[in-house]
Amino acid sequence: MFSKETYTNRRKVLQGLVEKGVIIFLSGNECPNNYPANTYYPFRPDSSYLYFFGIIRDGLAGVIDVESGEVALYGDDVDVADIVLTVPVESLASQAEKVGVKKTGTFQQFLDYIKAEQAKGRQIHFLPPHRHQEKLLLQDTLGIHHTKQTEAASIELIKAVVKMRSVKEEQEIAEIEKACEIGYKMHTAAMIAGKPGVTEKYVGAVVTGEAMKYGWQVSFPTILTMHGEIMHGGPQFKEIEDGRLVLCDAGCENENFYCSDHTRTFPANGKFTQQQREIYTIVEQCHD
């Protein structure tokens, strides 16, 4: 999380880029495995919500009233029944204060507020949703069928967010560089482990484990394969063959959800053949 001033300033800039209406950002929800409370998948907040509100927590909604300038965060505090499945969690009001938001409320209050503002004829700005929970929520709240929400999303808000997030702040660049440092270690680990006789699965696990050693996650499932001609080929239970080239496409996501994403190709036995080296050099020169 960045400073309170960072999020306050970002929201002020956004208000200046959208003419009128109410802007909403949803943090997203935990993803259950086999029953609702069994959510051991790592929670990943929506990136645009995170950019403007910063709190890493599921089930939140950030709201910006463009005309009045009022900003609010809505969500439900963790109750006694939930605490047995989680570590103690700060109240939403306490968390909101850290990102410069004074007004908070329950998630039901958010739903009631949005319905009331829509009934007044105000435009509700939202970005194209990509998670089914958010699609169903928008359908129930705004009356927009889930198959029509991409078209109904606010073009004005999309352009404003793209304009802001396309230019990285110094602190964001530092976060990306942190992720790239671990990404480098992931790829060198692949080159060390990726020898003839071991499986692609094994090397893929080594690469993924390199990110997890630092308490981070991979930014996407590791791609490691002798068949680089197949786009996004995941590692298989195939032994790496002597003389083959191995493609590794991998990266990590740090604790602030900034990512690295590198692709490298290396010879399994540590040495290029003459033909491999010539082709590799041509591709490298074209890239550079």
Residue ranges and their predicted role:
Residues 1-288:
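Active-site neighborhoods and metal-handling regions in enzymes and metal-associated proteins
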